[in-house]
Amino acid sequence: MNDYLLWVDTSTKIASFHEVEASDLLHFEQYENFMNYLASLTAQGYRFQ
């Protein structure tokens, strides 16, 4: 089973695929939920690193 992790900083609208201080860690167990969340962040103008 794979786990999908994402760090999100809502103040700067940046999502990271690696640990970033002052960001909230989100954990997804299902790939489809992870991808849907990434799509929603993209629609909200988030940048990814």
Model-derived features: positions:
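A short, charged, amphipathic alpha-helix used as a generic interaction element across diverse proteins
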Residues: 26-48
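Short intrinsically disordered terminal tails
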Residues: 1-2, 47-49
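N-terminal acidic leader/helix
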Residues: 1-25
